[in-house]
Regions:
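A bilobed periplasmic-binding-protein/Venus flytrap-type ligand-binding module shared by bacterial periplasmic
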Residues: 119-129, 235-248, 271-272
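Pocket-flanking alpha-helical
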Residues: 50, 70-105, 191, 211-217
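A conserved helix-loop-strand patch within extracytoplasmic ligand-binding domains
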Residues: 106-155
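Ligand-binding pocket segment of bilobal, Venus flytrap-like solute-binding proteins
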Residues: 83-87, 156-225
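Short, polar/charged alpha-helical segment
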Residues: 44-63, 169
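Short, well-ordered beta-strand elements
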Residues: 32-45, 62-67, 148-152, 256
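Short helix-initiation/N-cap motifs at beta->coil->alpha
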Residues: 41-44, 62-77, 179-191
Length: 318
């Protein structure tokens, strides 16, 4: 079965489950569990998202337990029943772990909780304004010199740095004589900060959602060769729930299914939490208070554990 067919079937299965939950709306409050155990890798986006979700469900009568686990371990604990949900199912980056859990029938894919996620060759906006919009242009010798024939990336051995190394080895976009400069993520972003301060040309591995987008006005170049994946590096960021948990807790499953943000919204709160080093609870609380329309969408048809209006309960807590 090809990837597209598998993804389509996954979506259909997820929608079938949620449709069944929606039809069971009169019984939505009768969840089996009063606790939601969230897999939270040490990434700023999912850290804030998980806190937002925790602040949504606590006034409804549930307890949120945030488990500090890597994504790989998280897929294992979702299968073993030691975790309940995960808000950072990045695909195709986690495809192997995701496919194994799906094949075991252990998880339900509730779809994307972030729209507009993408990764690829990134540049500051002033480079785009100078006419550079596609990675294909890196093959131009004059343009290559402007970038000092260097692409900055994150940790050596990471999936995305391996993708860059493969592109250099295969001379994709004329990168055969370029250097791939792997570093820590903070190290790479320090190079970006220094270049932007002087309006120097720089190309680096970038992704959205991330605070680099608003901070450095980052743009991602077209990637027709698919160095960073198909469809110009567009990514899915899935809400993944342990299947037994979703079936036993239709009220929370509905909320999880409706929990969706834009990449720009997530980039903004990542910036506040990670770059400005603000308290995650304060960032989450202020975000909820400032986005009543999203709050209403998250909680449509959802009730408190004792059958009362969920939106009123959350608003009273903010």
């Amino acid at each position: 079965m090809d990837t597209k067919t598998r993804s389509t079937l996954t979506l259909i299965n997820g929608l079938t489950l949620i449709t069944g939950l929606a039809l069971a709306a009169p019984a939505l409050a009768a969840d089996r569990d009063d606790r939601l155990r969230l897999v939270v890798p040490p990434w700023p986006g999912v850290t804030v998202k998980s806190e937002i979700l925790a602040q949504l469900i606590t006034p409804l009568g549930y307890t949120a337990e945030q488990q500090q686990l890597s994504s790989t371990v998280g897929y294992s604990t979702l299968q073993s029943g030691d975790s309940d949900a995960f808000l950072a199912g990045w695909l195709p980056a986690q495809q192997e772990s995701y496919d194994a859990a799906m094949a075991a029938g252990a998880i339900v894919d509730l779809g994307n909780n972030v729209t507009g996620a993408r990764m690829g060759f990134a540049v500051p906006s002033y480079v785009v304004e100078a006419g550079i919009t596609s990675a294909e242009q890196l093959a131009d010798p004059e343009i290559a010199e402007r970038f000092d024939r260097t692409v900055y990336s994150i940790e050596s051995g990471s999936t995305v740095t391996d993708m860059l190394d493969a592109a250099i080895e295969s001379d994709t976009y004329g990168l055969g004589d370029w250097d791939g400069m792997a570093s820590s993520t903070p190290g790479m972003l320090a190079e970006v900060k220094a270049a932007v301060a002087e309006e120097q040309w720089i190309v680096f591995y970038g992704w959205t959602p991330h605070w680099m987008v608003p901070e450095y006005d980052t743009r991602i170049l077209d990637d027709p060769a698919g160095v960073y994946g198909p469809d110009n590096g567009r990514s899915d960021v899935k809400t993944i729930v342990a299947k037994p948990y979703a079936e036993a807790n239709p009220n929370l499953a509905r909320l999880l299914d409706q929990f969706e943000l834009t990449a720009a919204q997530q980039s903004d709160f990542i910036r506040e939490y990670s770059l400005e080093e603000r308290d995650v609870e304060a960032v989450a609380r202020e975000w909820l208070a400032a986005h009543p329309e999203r709050l209403a969408a998250f909680l449509e048809g959802v009730e408190t554990r004792d059958g009362k209006n969920a939106q009123a309960a959350v608003e009273a807590s903010l």
